[in-house]
């Protein structure tokens, strides 16, 4: 009987020890699971931060590309404006040359008209002198008459040339007015283009400043990205280490779970033995 009591007492103590060890194992398992969850949360947070930095870098790079395209378009527009200004300058020079030639032709026509008028006046004076002297020489009279006719013809031709010159001069004046109008329009266009060129230049400077700032931001972001990349590598190393620790802990958990299962089976076996012992005692 004493042996049975001692055995029951030993089994009771062993049962209590098994319960304590089981509780300790469960607490240790819970702590390990909490550490595992914390490590997984840190890893998720690091991956999210890295993704956000990648998106920010893509956005800055896209803004830099847009600024480059705008700068190239502005430079192209400036070149086009400079070409237009050169074209207007050449046209103005051609108009001025044409006006100078027209004025020179008009002066030559007026000079020829004056010479023809002088010749006609001289012939008329000669005819009057011949008439006053009553020269009876028909040949000379015929010649003089012919000279007079020629002089009249020259005078008429001079008048015609004068009229033609006057008409051309009028046309030239109209062309000159048109040229002056076109010149004024060209000067206005040049002024407008100069203002536009100045605006474009200011825009180019602003774009260049924006590009410089974007470049500085890009350098800053590149430095940040390098830092984040290093931090990500460190995080990945820590994550790998954490995964290694988790795997190790998982193995420990599996071992503890197996040990817990064995303890539970052992506890069940002890409980069954106690039940059997109590049954034997009750049967006695």
Swiss-Prot record:
MF term (GO), any: protein homodimerization activity
Subunit structure: Homodimer.
Gene3D superfamilies, per the entry: 1.20.5.170, 1.20.5.340
Protein function: Tropomyosin, in association with the troponin complex, plays a central role in the calcium dependent regulation of muscle contraction.
Domain of life, per lineage: Eukaryota
Chain segments annotated as coiled-coil in the UniProt record: 1-280
Keywords: Allergen, Coiled coil, Muscle protein, Repeat
Family affiliation: Belongs to the tropomyosin family.
Pfam families to which the protein is assigned, alphabetical: Tropomyosin
Domain remarks: The molecule is in a coiled coil structure that is formed by 2 polypeptide chains. The sequence exhibits a prominent seven-residues periodicity.
Organism from which the protein derives: Sinonovacula constricta
Gene Ontology biological process: regulation of muscle contraction
Protein name: Tropomyosin
